[in-house]
């Protein structure tokens, strides 16, 4: 089985397991990243709430998630758990999140090349069905959401 497929299904399993825990604590589960790197992996859970996230919020969620992970044991390798806010360079995971940030500058990395490239940096123009519309210079790209490996807002300090 392809490693990307394993990570993707693992990510879906973790999302189904952990998102309800985060929501039950009164936070939004902004997104989950799981990267298997050799013998050590990283599980990063992004939380958000109205008014922002404090360090104490991350600690509360981390304790609860750790308990669930200890009982359910969905990760068979050694890993580090990080709970954090999305921050200024907010990662984008869903079409709804992309739609919320139309008009912002974004950086997008694809899982595999699309129209000869994997990296796109430009203006987020919108969402059309299952595609994210990004304008790079004078060209618009319709990037399928399922091809996006990583996407982040580029903060502007105007």
Swiss-Prot record:
Q: What family does this belong to?
A: Belongs to the RimP family.
Q: What does this protein do?
A: Required for maturation of 30S ribosomal subunits.
* Keyword annotations: Cytoplasm, Ribosome biogenesis
Query: By what name is this protein known?
Result: Ribosome maturation factor RimP
Spell out the InterPro entries in the cross-references.
Ribosome_maturation_RimP (IPR003728), RimP_C (IPR028998), RimP_C_sf (IPR036847), RimP_N (IPR028989), RimP_N_sf (IPR035956)
Q: Which GO terms describe its cellular component?
A: cytosol
Name where it mostly resides: cytoplasm
The record's subcellular location field reads:
Cytoplasm
Q: Name one GO biological process term.
A: ribosomal small subunit assembly
HAMAP family hit by this protein:
RimP
